[in-house]
Amino acid sequence: NKHLRRRYSFFWRHKVRLLLVTGDEAAIEQLVPGLQESQWLEGNCTVLIYGGSLTAEHDTEKYAALRKLRRGRPLDGIVRVIPQSFNLTPQVSDNDLRGLEKISELLRYSAPVWRWQLCSSHWSQGTRPEQAVGASFPPRAKEDDVIRQLELMLPALRAQGMSQVAENSSHDFLLRLGQHLKDGGIARWAQQLVPWLSASQQRVPLRGLMFSLSGSQSPENAVAYTDAENYVPESQRHALTLPATWQGIVDDCPRVRGRRVGMAWEQTLAWILMIIIG
């Protein structure tokens, strides 16, 4: 709270996006180097918070602190990082959803969720211009909505992909992703995301699906976190240079809100008890 107030003034709660990043340690490290070590990183009006595995025991103290940090809306969103070549089975989805439901109970707030797929490349694309790549789903999305939103990505992936390949033949990420989605990838995603849609469950709002190359972060974030005490000044230990790949989620945060969990039931119970006692 003191750090954010010092950086963004007393009104930081209206300016700053708070995002919880979940998944296995290796996947999170690939997407946000140093996040596990630092536990949180801040920059560009965005705070990324380490959430760890959704199947692990949850840190109740952390979520209690988050609930107090910004009452009413403790998080703007939750990102579930998916490793390369990961098979999203119904069992994995069920485990994820149960973990997210538990976090919602601890926060008393169900935040929008983005799934973030890390993609591989057989050669380095570190100099490729980065941009946010993904699709947003409407509230209470159905399978047809997933298909439609992913299909809407294809023209831009093709146009931008051709432009990047023309500049550098090794920068083929967008072109290959578009071809993958066109050649059955969209249908597979629509089928794999069925457990996340409103027809299957109501408690976890799936907002979108993002894609990026693994380890594609800006070089400014590649700090020697293994020995942070020696290499990073105290004032910069939680500094984040937010990559352009995050801009889609950050820009989407003001357009979508989560919902409170449990509060209406608790208030109703309190009223009933007051009537009985009074």
PLM feature segments, named:
Residues 1-278:
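Basic, amphipathic N-terminal segments
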